[in-house]
Amino acid sequence: MKEVISRDAALAALKEYNHEPFHIQHALTVEGVMRWYANELGYGEDADFWATAGLLHDIDFEMWPEQHCLKAPELLEKAGCDADLIHAVCSHGYGLVCGVEPVHEMEKVLFAADELTGLIGAAARMRPSKSVMDMEVSSLKKKFKDKKFAAGCSRDVITTGAERLGWTLEELMEKTILAMRSCEDSVNAAMAAL
């Protein structure tokens, strides 16, 4: 079992450098998605580690967007994170903003799911329910093909992420929708409490 800072300490570190509700909501979503994946893929004993990497993956993005994944090691070290967590967090920016390659399965999931949660979240907001609970893969695939929809979500990163995991794009979408369903209520409750 990997050692990890407490969730309270991780959340405090996130909020020290992130104030926009959108960024906090995204971090909480990726945290929940990563916890789901850890349990789903047989890494349940390391679920806290996976979730913490998800929570802190964009710790530097709001204040230092031009140094994304480059400023993070300093901030994470200050928060008490170890080298494994720092590597995991930075690896989600591989090929885009840094050269830290995702090697461990958790890092590959973070690389793929981070970008996909943005696309799924945007698609959910367009639904009458405003929820991922009734979203189907077929409707997400249509949004994925529409390059103008959620244009900031890189389809190349999502596709490359699926390939790195050895999954089809459809498998990645299906799993990530299920992961987002698992945490939607808790994320909404946390955001309402802010």
Language-model regions, residue ranges each:
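Short polybasic/polar patches that bind polyanions
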Residues: 15, 39, 77, 145, ...
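A structured, mid-to-C-terminal "fold-capping" secondary-structure block
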Residues: 138-194
